[in-house]
């Protein structure tokens, strides 16, 4: 009867009073049968409280206390009555005994009996007392004892609050964190967030617990949610952390931004509004945490560029350039923003510095360009590369070639241009890889002379790498595609003598291995280049002589 809610349907104040009086009479009968029965005394005290007879309730509780001085259910009722009557010192002593007993759950059965305003008094008292204990908490071995005492008061405050004790839950969770009880702290943070999903302090607290449990992704998730809601609260929390704790968290935020940006740019799917908010919140927060970190400045520049906020992006880029004037990553972004303004030449100059240094970062920046911007960039970069190469500076031309290739998608013309640069720089392996990419493109009949020249170039590269057999094979393919053009090219380089020597050595090896048709082809190709070569003529005779009857030579 006492536990009925005040909002019980059709329940008038008079009826409630009647219930309480009936309970009191029943409790009095029970006490008459057994004066030492604590439950009956508590029932009588609760009924008297509901009847507004606080002094009589107090007397009833004193009787129960005399029989069991440490009974937490009696102590907490007495404390609440003393608070109601304004006797704060007495109430504090009683609450202290309850806290020391550890039986904070005794409040559970009182929530529907005592008036909300009285429970609020108890909650405020316990919460305030816990904060006082924590503020006065000493260092060393006594620190843990004070923290546990504060937890006991907070637990009373939480029970008294029912479902509205988020502040006490928050402080208790932090106390558990201080004691290293991470999972218990997580339980309290989760309890807050179930009722208040947007509680920023709880999100921050849970993020730090996740971090302590090596759950970095979950920590970043919570911190991002908090940053979107109230960066002004979150940033001081992060700044208050020790460096060894702050570092993985800020790095996690940085990485999350990069992943989101890359996913958006590479898939072509526009960012959702919540992702945009998260990116801006993270990017701006990192700057406020450490404005002297160049990579974070560049991150915010990229975020703003991706969102089309070029002027604001330029402002942050200038800060990055001020911090690290020689940064190639910053210079490349300056080039990108210049391209957005229509200055293609300046853009090419800025972006080419990454082409040979950091192709991954350059690839990211190129994704920020639309198709016409890319096309202009490719054409200008290729033209600049060709001009510089003509001036005899392959090292400088190389980065422009690479920019054209990365922006233009492995265009054969641009690849051949880079092959020429790499060959002059004697980077034969890399030149060969580029040329092989060219040769993977199917050739039309009109392209056969061009492809023949590609095989001549391939043979020369293999020759430079010491692979004479490979060179002979490439020269053979060139002669098969366009004989006259290939002969002229080979006579020019590597020259008549060297080309004939390559075919001679290859033919001799084929003959020794009894690959008669290959040997014959090598001899014939060698004599095309040098018809009077005595060694090749002798090899031709030997090949005819040793060839078996089953091998037809033409």
Curated annotation (Swiss-Prot):
Keyword Repeat: yes
Spans of repeat TPR: 38-71, 166-199, 200-233, 294-327, 328-361, 411-445, 452-485, 500-533
Alphabetic keyword roster: Repeat, TPR repeat
UniProt-recorded name of the protein: Tetratricopeptide repeat protein 34
Organism of this sequence: Mus musculus (Mouse)
PROSITE patterns xref list: TPR, TPR_REGION
Domain of life from the UniProt record: Eukaryota
Keyword Repeat: yes
InterPro entries, A to Z: TPR-like_helical_dom_sf, TPR_rpt, TTC34
């Amino acid at each position: 009867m006492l536990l009925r809610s005040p909002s019980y349907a059709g329940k008038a104040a008079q009826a409630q009073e009647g219930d309480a009086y009936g309970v009191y009479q029943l409790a009095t009968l029970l006490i008459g049968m057994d004066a030492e029965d604590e439950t009956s005394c508590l029932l009588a005290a609760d009924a008297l409280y509901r009847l507004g007879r606080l002094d009589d309730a107090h007397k009833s509780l004193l009787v129960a206390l005399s029989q069991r001085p440490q009974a937490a259910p009696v102590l907490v009722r007495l404390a609440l009555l003393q608070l109601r009557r304004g006797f704060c010192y007495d109430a504090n002593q009683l609450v202290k005994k309850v806290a020391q007993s550890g039986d904070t759950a005794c409040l559970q059965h009182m929530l529907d009996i005592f008036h909300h305003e009285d429970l609020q008094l108890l909650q405020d008292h316990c919460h305030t007392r816990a904060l006082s204990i924590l503020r006065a908490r000493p260092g060393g071995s006594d620190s843990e004892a004070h923290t546990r005492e504060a937890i006991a008061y907070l637990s009373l405050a939480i029970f008294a609050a029912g479902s509205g004790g988020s502040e006490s839950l928050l402080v208790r969770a932090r106390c558990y964190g201080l004691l290293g009880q991470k999972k218990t702290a997580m339980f309290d943070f989760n309890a807050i967030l179930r009722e208040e999903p947007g509680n920023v302090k709880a999100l921050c607290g849970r993020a730090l617990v996740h971090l302590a449990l090596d759950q970095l992704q979950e920590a970043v998730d919570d911190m991002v949610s908090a940053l979107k809601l109230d960066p002004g609260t979150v940033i001081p929390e992060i700044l208050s952390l020790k460096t060894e704790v702050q570092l993985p968290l800020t790095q996690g935020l940085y990485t999350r931004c990069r992943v989101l940006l890359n996913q958006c740019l590479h898939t072509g799917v526009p960012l959702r509004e919540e992702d945009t908010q998260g990116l801006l919140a993270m990017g701006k927060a990192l700057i406020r945490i450490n404005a002297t970190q160049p990579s974070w400045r560049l991150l915010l520049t990229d975020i703003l560029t991706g969102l089309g906020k070029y002027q604001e992006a330029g402002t942050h880029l200038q800060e990055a350039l001020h911090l690290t004037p020689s940064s190639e990553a910053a210079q490349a972004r300056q080039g990108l923003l210049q391209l957005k303004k229509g200055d293609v030449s300046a853009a090419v100059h800025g972006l080419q510095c990454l082409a040979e240094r950091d192709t991954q970062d350059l690839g990211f920046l190129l994704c920020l360009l639309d198709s016409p911007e890319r096309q202009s960039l490719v054409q200008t970069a290729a033209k600049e590369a060709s001009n510089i190469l003509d001036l005899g500076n392959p090292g400088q031309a190389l980065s422009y070639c690479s920019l054209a290739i990365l922006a233009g998608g492995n265009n054969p013309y641009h690849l051949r241009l880079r092959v020429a640069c790499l060959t002059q720089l004697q980077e034969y392996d890399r030149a060969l890889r580029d040329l092989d990419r060219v040769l993977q493109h199917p050739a039309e009949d009109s392209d056969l002379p061009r492809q023949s020249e590609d095989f001549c170039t391939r043979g020369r590269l293999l020759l430079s790498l010491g692979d004479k057999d490979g060179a002979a094979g490439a020269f053979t393919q060139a002669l098969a595609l366009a004989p006259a053009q290939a002969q002229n090219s080979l006579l020019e380089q590597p020259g008549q003598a060297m080309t004939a020597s390559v075919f001679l050595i290859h033919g001799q090896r084929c003959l020794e291995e009894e690959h008669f048709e290959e040997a014959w082809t090598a001899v014939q190709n060698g004599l095309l280049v040098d018809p009077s070569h005595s060694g090749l003529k002798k090899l031709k005779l030997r090949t005819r002589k040793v060839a078996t009857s089953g091998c037809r030579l033409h």
